[in-house]
Each structure stands twice: as structure tokens, then as C-alpha cells.
Amino acid sequence: MIRAIVFDLDNTLVDFMRMKDDAVRAAIEGMIDAGLNLPRETVRARIDAIYQERGLEFQQVFDVLLEREFGQVDPRILASGIIAYRRARASALTLYPHTQLALHELVRRGIRLGVVSDAPRMQVWLRLCELSLQHTFDAVVTFDDTRERKPGAAPFREVLSRLGVPATEALMVGDWAERDVVGGRSLGMKTAFARYGDTFETQESGADFDIDDIFELVGIADRINGATGSAAPPVGAPARPPAPAR
């Protein structure tokens, strides 16, 4: 039986990499317009290198860029980059197709929903609120809640505790096999690999299910729970049964 489904956030519910790319591109244009005298390709390479060092959630990337290049931070250039980044992020932060409908159908079936993310607490909640999902999930666990990243057991144990369900009655859904799938399976959760969000060209996910559309989770839950009268897949969603993991 499946009583709860736990989601990774980035590249599982939201297309994080597209959002990040659009926002960084906009920030570069904003800084150049404000007087940054560097080629776009050079600026992008420098920014990518800083993210590689500090992580994609690092919030002072433009400060570090300017300090390294010029030995000081020009507030006009910095502010222009930040504003352009925020505006582009807000417009580019979107859910994957059929996510709202899938979440609605799962809640309608009485399935509890959770989120486990390696991102900082405030960044997770900002994304959820921007997407109007702040009231959707029964439990949200971020890096700041356990100080341990997936596939470590602590974040999975924490979300299961908050949801009030045993691991054997929960399904973990994520795009990163080595973190989401491995971490969930290690505790005895069923697992689904969000192939639609995979950025690593994963061949063998090791998950119980591979899904190409998030709405497939509704069929998985119905099948495991023996439900009848399942909701029809939305237009554009795969009509076939969920694929076994490859």
C-alpha cells in the first residue's frame, strides 16, 4: 500500500535547470548593460566556475564574480544583475506539465505528500510559495532541517516521521538516481525515477518505476493500492502503464 509520496523538488516538480539558465543569462545581460566590460562567454564561464565551487544555491555569486575580476564590487553592476536575475527567475520558474493535476489527484485519494530537498530552507520555501504550493505538502524537509544531504538516511527518516508513515508505505520520487533512488531504497521505500527531469543521461536508475510524466504516479498509486476508476491521463500525458525501471 502507498500512503505517502515524497518528492524531490528541483528537476522533479520544477524545471530548475531551465530556470537557472534563463536567470543567469538575464543577469549577465543586466550587468553588461550597467557597464560590465567583459564578453558574455567569459562572464558565463566565470559564473559557472563559482557555482561549481560553491554550489548552485550560492547566493553571492555576482559579488564574488566582480570581486575576483576587479578587486571590488560595483553596486550599480551588482544591483542590475540581481534585479535581472530575479525577474527572469520569477518568469522561468514553472512546474513540469501535469504536476498540479497529479498532486490534486493524489491528495483526492488521501495520499499524504512530502518534499525532501538538499536546497537551503528559505530557497525551498521561496520556490514553493512562488508556485503556490505552500499548502500542498504535509511535510517539507530541507538541508537545514537535518544538515545531511541525500542519499543520507536522516532527511528521509525526518520526512517519514513528519508524514507519520512507515518507509514500506511510502514512494520516493526524484530525478537523481544516486541520491533520490538510492536514499529511498536504503530505508525500504518504493522508488520512482523522474526520467523527464534527468540531466545525467542515466541509463539504469535502479528504481522500481521509471516515469516520463509525473501524472504516471497516479496510476502507480492506484495499481499498488488496488483502486478502481482511476482518473484519465491529461492530454499529452502517456496513456501506457508506468514503465518498469530500466
Region annotations inferred by a language model:
Residues 1-5, 17-18, 68, 100, ...:
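Asp-based, Mg2+/Mn2+-dependent phosphohydrolase catalytic module
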